[in-house]
Amino acid sequence: MQLGMIGLGRMGANMTKRLEDHGLDLKTYDPKVDSTASTLEELRDQLDAPRTFWMMVPAGEITEQTFQTLLDLAERGDVIVDGGNSNFRDSQRRCREAKQRGIGFVDCGTSGGIWGLSVGYCLMVGGEDDAVAQAEPAFIALAPDDGYAHVGGPGAGHFTKMVHNGIEYGLMQAYAEGFEVMEKSEFDLDLHEIAGIWRYGSVVRSWLLELLHAAFEKEGTDLEKIHGYVEDSGEGRWTIAEAIAEDVPVPVISAALFARFASRQDESFAAKVTAALRNQFGGHAVKAVQTAEAATQDPR
């Protein structure tokens, strides 16, 4: 099978290597690194019809621009796969737009990160049967045994990956809170050792726990060189928004997202308001902000 890979970042480059290792003929395009094609048009011309293109670019504007360009370049019978973290509503729309031109569209939720090259990628695939079938040799090559499924129609792949990432937020937050309780305890606990033994036979064993054990090994258990500032890439927000639309309570995922928001605050205005209110209604003491001038005054 021939495949046109668009985007050779960490994920795209590793996926390209895994596909080639499994015997696929890869043509590539990335304006920032060496690739077989210098333009998307040249990439199209390097592939035999019917073509399969795989977009592995950042979600949002770049994905939309790439998709629209491919729509103009592709021919009837070609298939476009989006392996990034696009919003499933955008994927449904893109499938409709592609179908109007006789072009297939497949949304593929991809999990595995930088480890996927060696162990394979979990693939959650959405799309119509004929389009999925055309791209299936690539899915089989990329995934480990039992790690790929056609989960539903257009949008279903990215919807499933969205929820996957929402769950991931909750799992990481639970580990983070538990290890902080242990770190603050009266016991001199070796967190690296505990993360290690929990990997074997424990109810809470997981790949995330293995990664945490590796992080403690690399960074030390105090993590003193890491600032506790946590970004989010959007999927947690989308999961919560969809849960609200479906009247589904998701308190754990919501709390995990809000904890990330809190991690980015140098000072919480909400906490200031609460402190001010307690002072007003009960005369409770407040802790004054120490200004730079006050900090440099002679304490005598």
List where the protein language model places each region.
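Rossmann-fold NAD(P) dinucleotide-binding segment
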Residues: 40-106
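Rossmann-fold dinucleotide-binding core
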Residues: 66, 87-177, 185
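Hydrophobic beta-strand scaffold residues
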Residues: 26, 104-106, 250
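Conserved dinucleotide-binding and phosphotransfer motif residues
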Residues: 22, 101, 246
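NAD(P)+-binding Rossmann beta1-loop-alpha1 motif at the extreme N-terminus of oxidoreductases
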Residues: 1-51, 73-77, 114-116, 279
